[in-house]
A protein has these predicted regions:
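C-terminal and inter-domain tail/linker signature
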Residues: 1-131
């Protein structure tokens, strides 16, 4: 039994981020008109449109955690046009620890990530961590 391609795509995105391989993310995983929705009031919150903005967000997230950020997917549940991932996010910044669980919802179009919504378990903690 082969793995659902939506699961493979989601897993590949987390693997590429873990390796810092943003070129692979850009060239193979993101749709041209990709949109990331990031909740909150912190410096990373907002809506990122297009590959350049999304990759800028991912690079800034990594930079603000001194490269310590880790996204560990617990489960990946494919749907018809959305794929849901329960994920643990960990990192360190200025001596503070981040350890949060949340949900990422991906819209996958033509085999690429076209949209992602982030739903952290503790949004207040995420905002405080990045202040």
């Amino acid at each position: 039994v082969s793995e659902d391609p939506k699961i493979t795509l989601a897993r590949d995105s987390y693997d590429a981020l873990a390796k810092g391989d943003l070129d692979h993310v850009r060239d193979n995983l993101l749709a041209d008109e990709v949109v990331f929705h990031v909740p909150g009031r912190g410096p990373l919150a907002g809506e990122y449109r297009g590959k350049d903005q999304v990759l800028g967000y991912l690079a800034k997230f990594t930079e603000m955690t001194d490269g310590s950020v880790r996204f560990e997917p617990d489960s990946i549940i494919p749907g018809e046009d959305r794929t849901v991932v329960t994920v643990r996010v960990q990192g360190e910044r200025a001596g503070r620890q981040l350890d949060d669980r949340g949900v990422h919802v991906f819209r996958i179009t033509d085999g690429k990530i076209s949209e992602r919504w982030s739903y952290p378990q503790d949004l207040y903690n995420i905002d405080a961590f990045f202040e």
